[in-house]
Amino acid sequence: MIRRICLDHFRRVENKCIELSRFSLLYGPPNAGKTTFMEGAALLIQSRGEQWLAFEGPLLIIHEPEDVHFGGDLERPFAVELSVEVEGELITYGYRYATASNYVEQWVGKDGKLLARMAKRGERGALLYPVEADLCVAPYAVMNEDALITCGAVEDERLRVAERALLTLRVGLKDKFYLLSGRRLAAWKYTYETHVDLMPATSVGPEGQFTAHHLSRILTQAAYERTRELLYAYLPLAGVEDVRVGLVKSGRIAMYVKSGGLWTNAYNAGNYTKAVLPVLLQLLLANPGSAVFVDDADLAVPATHAERLLGAFLEIARARGLQLVLAAKEPAFATAAERLGLEVVSL
């Protein structure tokens, strides 16, 4: 479970941390930083185990470094820090980077105590804590023990503990984080063609782009019988009576929904259905114990539907042992969240 996210000069957040519980709502006006916190966490998590920050990955795509540097200043480093509860331990991991100089700095801690800090020094790297030592390479590797390889032997148990903490965090976050962005309406403008071997096993994609593909599996495969039952139980919440998936002439998968007794292509469905259905499906598919982050949870949702919708999301999350973190700007969502027992984080 993700307990804390800290950002320093990342996108529009100058320096701020937020504390999260199992069920949280990030609430604030437009441009308050709700998306920034979610995407900061996503950037680190999609980069886990990589040799560099993965600006383009399965959770989000960042085309230019200027997009994440505060004020577009490539000289000033940005930093993202996560505190994650894994196997009964609270592991903190931070990554600082400046595009102009390629400066990098990392740190890892456990249960509130710093275990190791390393940074780029010259063309190589240096271990700054718990002792000073030269690193064989600059510590660019993300959430990876490779960033702690020293050129000589270092006899300090804290370094071994730091290596184990990085391994625990990297493995513990595998297939345990899902992000649904506010761009999920765009995916419904066209059908997707993808090889099933390349499709995420349990993710509908950050833009809901694999919604139809997963529905095809759920509706046709016996292994998804329980998921199918739950889907139909919650389907009216998305404003539709039934759903079908089929192939169009190009060989691509297309989705059809039934509403008011009539069938139509999902492209013709209202924005409410387009916004809500991928979220419901993601909650039903997510691996137990995962964190599901939903940006713009109030997207195309009338204020009168807020409590009913949040209540259903919460019900599924509780039943499946998920962490649920939502973001919304509508006051009705904050009011409903408080009534339902979600922690409201005001930005």
What residue spans do the PLM features occupy?
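Phosphate-coordinating catalytic segments in nucleotide- and nucleic-acid-processing enzymes
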Residues: R48-V276, N287
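Switch/communication elements of ASCE P-loop NTPase nucleotide-binding domains
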Residues: M1-G71, E85, D242-L347
